Curated annotation (Swiss-Prot):
In the N-terminal section; belongs to the enoyl-CoA hydratase/isomerase family. In the C-terminal section; belongs to the 3-hydroxyacyl-CoA dehydrogenase family. The active site is at residue 450. Residues 311-729 are annotated as: 3-hydroxyacyl-CoA dehydrogenase. NCBIfam families: FadB, PRK11730.1. The keyword Lyase applies. It holds the Pfam family 3HCDH. GO terms for cellular component: fatty acid beta-oxidation multienzyme complex. This is Fatty acid oxidation complex subunit alpha. Substrate binds at residues 296, 500, 660. Keywords: Fatty acid metabolism, Isomerase, Lipid degradation, Lipid metabolism, Lyase, Multifunctional enzyme, NAD, Oxidoreductase. Heterotetramer of two alpha chains (FadB) and two beta chains (FadA). Involved in the aerobic and anaerobic degradation of long-chain fatty acids via beta-oxidation cycle. Catalyzes the formation of 3-oxoacyl-CoA from enoyl-CoA via L-3-hydroxyacyl-CoA. It can also use D-3-hydroxyacyl-CoA and cis-3-enoyl-CoA as substrate. Residues 708-729 are annotated as: Disordered.
């Protein structure tokens, strides 16, 4: 053994060839600060070996290196700029020394090589991969850019266009694509990986492969003519500006850095990467996006722990076909759980099956499946007008009309047709689960399962625990949602549960702004362009359905009369009374016509202004700051109340539900991350300016306490002390 660290070791393999093996305790290899330091020590040992002829890098895990240790990021981002820059210089000196070894090097890459893992293998001369490879640089999705030389080496290896596509979009690619663009040199079966890598090393050692020529382009300026450079970088900057926008600075910074570094050799190019990385790491956007990643891991880990002792349902059923039922049936069948889809009429069943077939055909068009797979999946969805097969199902989700009487009748009837241990769930969006449970003989086997539309796209499923729902019931439904590829978040029961309960105060803020003379077009523009929502409130209401919102608004008002009961006729009432229900009937705040792809496209409709004038004060101008404050304060206050009342368990789960269920702007990180970034004292000052607008603007006592003591909702993070000898940087 030449060297043994906590996460890697170095040993002779054969005949002057050494192997450096990543072997972190636990299930995956991560390139954390300690591993980078350990890698530097191992390379120091290699530099002393006079009889070294070649080096093989490999992993003892199912994946090569999944990336940097993102749990370190938040504390690393608090390190002062100069110190963080120094540490990056140190880390890059380690990869440079790997790249500069006086012998050929190869990485045998299996499974994932992402982020720092990808940057590590870019420093070797050759890369041999297995068919399950996923390799790429996802850093821009976390609000940063590659910091271990990825923005320098990848463009010089692949050419500017291919590298920009991966780096700016935070993409990863599979084995075939990696081979095609030159990111790996070969693909072999897993059992041949080490043998194949040694064979390539031997060819390089014997002079059959010119490893020095392979290495040289990575040390030099990027070989691009002025015209080629202008075309590549201008197109890339235009596309990034269009897709990422001003709220996500990392992609455009990465492109500009690669452009600026193109004319320099490795050392100066790495200095430019360093100078760009450090300011990005100190942005609120980076902290928010890393926070989302960590919250996502927390939520998924919680679901895994919750379901460890239950069996995932093997057969499911959906009550109520149509678009929603068809979407749920498709998602279940697509992920391998056969489903019976029941309705009371053929027309709805046909609609449900058509929806499932349409979604599968899209997968076929994209080349994700072939005709055989399509037929196989669709054959596991069984449409029926009766309860045939219900005695075999493990879980049933009801997705009928949002009417408590109808839902109770359907659930009570279904309970008599299934096994005593079958779990029932309701896909209600607002009706309390404990109220629906009153119709059942086995309320302990019942809970809520709130999907979001469109089911195949929206990652969140709210799992609602009723007063009598058993732990096993919750666990089984969480297991099914996870199997469907969804992110399940368990919430306690109340009108609207969590997501809709906090959404309707936001809509109330919108209604009050309209009542006071604000224009809906400006509100939408501000909430989309300035705050960052994917849709403004008017457009969102059109998509949700004005009739749906009108009904839900009444349910929420009955549930929370003190805050949500309004004493005036609002815009939602005016449009509802005029039979303007949004996209579903082509008339809402906008008029809708189908484009060439059959998607609804919004157009101006002056009739709306006349309708709104009847429920509004004369038009007046509002600042962007006031619009954002008046829209967001009611929502954030309600989010805080939900945490204080135990409707949602943690800030992490609340923020993920908002991001995954409502599209809360990821660069803000969710309501609690936004609160922490703003500071609760500053938020309190802002909210107090609008207290005269009513109870929705009154800040909950718990948040007032946070403001008094300057306490954040997320645990405070201490700056990291990166491992590594900064003197060698």
């Amino acid at each position: 053994m030449l060297y043994k660290g906590d996460t890697l070791y170095l040993d002779w393999l054969e005949d002057g060839i050494a192997e450096l093996v990543f072997d972190t305790p636990g299930s995956v290899n991560k390139l954390d600060t300690a591993t980078v330091a350990s890698l530097g020590e191992a390379i120091g040992v290699l530099e002393q070996q006079s009889d070294l002829k070649g080096l093989l890098l490999r992993s003892n895990k199912a994946a090569f290196i999944v990336g940097a240790d993102i749990t370190e990021f938040l504390s690393l981002f608090l390190v002062p700029e100069e110190q963080l820059s120094q540490w990056l210089h140190f880390a890059n000196s380690v990869f440079n020394r790997l790249e500069d070894l006086p012998v050929p090097t190869i990485a045998a890459v299996n499974g994932y090589a992402l982020g720092g893992g990808c940057e590590c293998v870019l420093a070797t001369d050759y890369r041999l991969a297995t068919p399950d490879l996923r390799i790429g640089l996802p850093e821009t999705k976390l609000g940063i850019m590659p910091g271990f030389g990825g923005s320098v080496r990848m463009p010089r290896m692949l050419g500017a266009d291919s590298a920009l596509e991966i780096i700016a979009a935070g993409k990863d690619v599979g084995a075939d694509q990696a081979l095609k663009i030159g990111l790996v040199d070969g693909v072999v079966k897993a059992e041949k990986l080490v043998e194949g890598a040694i064979a390539i090393l031997r060819q390089a050692i014997n002079g059959d492969l010119d490893w020095k020529a392979k290495r040289q382009p990575k040390l030099e300026p990027l070989k691009l003519s002025k015209i080629e450079a202008a075309m590549s970088f201008t197109i890339a900057k235009g596309m990034v500006a269009q897709t990422a926008g001003k709220h996500y600075p990392a992609p455009i910074t990465a492109v500009k850095t690669i452009e600026a570094a193109a004319r320099f050799g490795r050392e100066e190019a790495l200095n430019l990467e360093n100078k760009s990385f450090v300011p990005l790491a100190h942005t609120n956007e980076a902290r928010a996006l890393v926070g989302i990643f960590l919250n996502d891991q927390y939520v998924k880990g919680k679901a895994k722990k919750l379901t460890k002792d239950v069996e995932t349902p093997k057969q499911a059923a959906v009550l109520g076909a149509g678009i929603m039922g068809g979407g749920i049936a498709y998602q279940s069948a697509w992920k391998g759980v056969p489903v019976v889809m029941k309705d009371i009429n053929d027309k709805s069943l046909t609609l449900g099956m058509t929806e499932a077939a349409k979604l599968l055909n899209k997968q076929l068009e994209r080349g994700k499946i072939d005709g055989l797979k399509l037929a196989g999946v669709i054959s596991t969805i069984h449409p029926t007008l009766d309860y045939a097969g219900f005695d075999r199902v493990d879980v049933v989700v009801e997705a009928v009309v949002e009417n408590p009487k109808v839902k109770k009748a359907v659930l009570a009837e279904t309970e008599q047709k299934v096994r005593p241990d079958t779990v029932l769930a309701s896909n209600t969006s607002t009706i309390p689960i404990s109220e629906l449970a009153n119709a059942l003989e086995r309320p302990e086997n019942f809970c809520g399962m709130h999907f979001f539309n469109p089911v195949h796209r929206m990652p969140l499923v709210e799992i609602i625990r009723g007063e009598k729902s058993s732990d096993e019931t919750i666990a089984k439904v969480v297991a099914w949602a996870s199997k469907m590829g969804k992110t399940p978040i368990v919430v306690n029961d109340c009108p609207g549960f969590f997501v809709n309960r906090v959404l309707f105060p936001y809509f109330a803020g919108f209604s009050q702004l309209l009542r006071d003379g604000a224009g809906f077009r400006k509100i939408d523009k501000v909430m989309e362009k300035q705050f960052g929502w994917p849709m403004g409130p008017a457009y969102l209401l059109d998509v949700v359905g004005i009739d749906t919102a009108h009904h839900a608004q009444a349910v929420m008002a009955a549930g929370f009369p003190q805050r949500m009961q309004k004493d005036y006729r609002d815009a939602i009432d005016a449009l509802f009374d005029a039979n303007r229900f949004g996209q579903k009937n082509g008339l809402g705040f906008w008029r809708y016509k189908e484009d060439s792809k059959g998607k609804p496209k919004k157009e101006e409709d002056v009739v709306v202004d006349d309708l709104l004038a009847k429920v509004s004060q004369p038009k007046r101008d509002f600042s962007e700051e006031e619009i954002i404050a008046r829209m967001m304060i009611p929502m954030v206050n309600e989010v805080v109340r939900c945490l204080e009342e135990g409707i949602i368990a943690t800030p992490a789960e609340a923020d993920m539900a908002l991001v995954y269920g409502l599209g809360f702007p990821p660069f803000h990180g969710g309501a609690f991350r936004w609160l922490d970034t703003l500071g609760s004292a500053k938020y309190l000052d802002m909210a107090q300016q609008y207290q005269h607008l009513g109870p929705l603007y009154e800040v909950p006592e718990g948040l007032r306490n946070k403001a008094r003591h300057n306490e954040p909702y997320y645990p405070p993070v201490e700056p990291a002390r990166p491992v590594g000898d900064l003197k060698t940087a």
